[in-house]
From Swiss-Prot:
Coiled coil: none annotated. Pfam families: Trm112p. Belongs to the UPF0434 family. GO terms for cellular component: cytosol. It comes from the Bacteria. It comes from Ralstonia nicotianae (strain ATCC BAA-1114 / GMI1000) (Ralstonia solanacearum). This is UPF0434 protein RSc2531.
Amino acid sequence: MDNRLLEILVCPLCKGTLQHDRAHNELICHVDKLAYPIRDGIPVMLADEARQTVEGTPVDPA
């Protein structure tokens, strides 16, 4: 995932920042507790495609 793209992408619901979880290939919104999948290098920024995250689950940024 391109770091320049990560800098401009925001959560489509709350417009908050996203954190890249490389281990699970997802973009995480901690405000809405949603994880948006990245498929074939393309972030799928649709709320219907996002999964709910578990409160307190650490994100692996490595």
